[in-house]
Amino acid sequence: MQALRVSRALIRSFNTTARNRFQNRVPEKQKLFQEDNDIPLYLKGGIVDNILYRVTMGLCLGGSAYSMYCLGWASFPRN
């Protein structure tokens, strides 16, 4: 019986606290991303998005170059 009360108390606390803890910022983000200001969508999030984009592109280009190097190295085996 006591376990049932404890489980109900835990469920009640999990159900009510998460809803009140965070403020809904979806309308703000929608306005930001729907503006027509000639900025690409992947850069509208600010400086963090810009850094993340550049790091991702750098890693993609580096990985592509390394894979081409490995293919070239494997295509000319040593005797």
Curated annotation (Swiss-Prot):
Primary location group: mitochondrion
Membrane topology recorded in Swiss-Prot or TrEMBL: Single-pass membrane protein
Mitochondrial matrix side: 22-46
Pfam family, one: COX7a
GO biological process, one term: regulation of oxidative phosphorylation
Transmembrane segments: 47-75
Subcellular location field: Mitochondrion inner membrane
One cellular-component annotation, GO: respiratory chain complex IV
FT transit peptide: 1-21
UniProt subunit comment: Component of the complex IV (CIV, cytochrome c oxidase), a multisubunit enzyme composed of 14 subunits. The complex is composed of a catalytic core of 3 subunits MT-CO1, MT-CO2 and MT-CO3, encoded in the mitochondrial DNA, and 11 supernumerary subunits COX4I1 (or COX4I2), COX5A, COX5B, COX6A2 (or COX6A1), COX6B1 (or COX6B2), COX6C, COX7A1 (or COX7A2), COX7B, COX7C, COX8B and NDUFA4, which are encoded in the nuclear genome.
Protein name stated in the entry: Cytochrome c oxidase subunit 7A1, mitochondrial
Organism name: Trachypithecus cristatus (Silvered leaf-monkey)
Lineage: Eukaryota, Metazoa, Chordata, Craniata, Vertebrata
Gene: COX7A1
